Amino acid sequence: LIRRQSVCAVIGKSPPQMIFDEVFVSIADLRDMLLPDVDLTANPWLFLHLTETLDKRVLASVSQHDDGSLNSNFSMNLNVSTILSDEFLTFDENINPSMRSSIVLELQLVDIFSDIKAFILAKTFAQYRGYKICIDGITVDKLKYIDREQLNGDLLKIIWHPSFMDMIREDSHFTDYVNRAERAKMI
C-alpha cells in the first residue's frame, strides 16, 4: 500500500525534471482492500489515529529499505505528532545524516493549525536536524491566507483540481499570492 509519486519541475518548454519521490500510503487503496463501503475519513479522530499508525509503518519501512531506492530526494506525508514521536527519533537515528537535507516532511495545513505549538516544536526540531518542511493541503482559494515565511516552511503544496482554473482566472491577485510564496518553493 506504500506508493510513490514523482514531484517534477516544469521550467519553460523543457520536459519535466524529477525533483523527488513522494512516499505515501494510498488511503483509497487501503479502503478498497479492507472496507470498500466505509469512508475512512468520515470520523476525523479515527482517521487521525489511522494515519498516525500508518506514519509509523512508513517510517519503519523507509528506514529499513535496503534496496537503495530511497537513499535521497523523497518526501513523506506525516502528522505533526509523528515527528514528535519515539518512532521518528528511531527513524532519524537509522538513516544516514547526510540524507536528511534531501528528505521533505509534508505536513497537512489542518494538522498544523489544530495545534500550532506542536507544529512549531516539530518543525523546529525537524529543520534543526536538516529535514525540509512542506506545508501540504493548500487549496487555490486558501493560498492568499498562507504566508510560507511566517510558518517557516521550506515548500508549499497546493491541492490541484481542474475547477481551480476558474478561481485563478477570477482572482486578479492570484499571481501576487504565488510570487509571495515564491514559485520555486511551490508544489
Enumerate the language-model features and the residues they cover:
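The catalytic core of metal-dependent phosphodiesterases that act on cyclic dinucleotides
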Residues: N96-I187
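Bacterial c-di-GMP phosphodiesterase EAL domain
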Residues: L1-P97
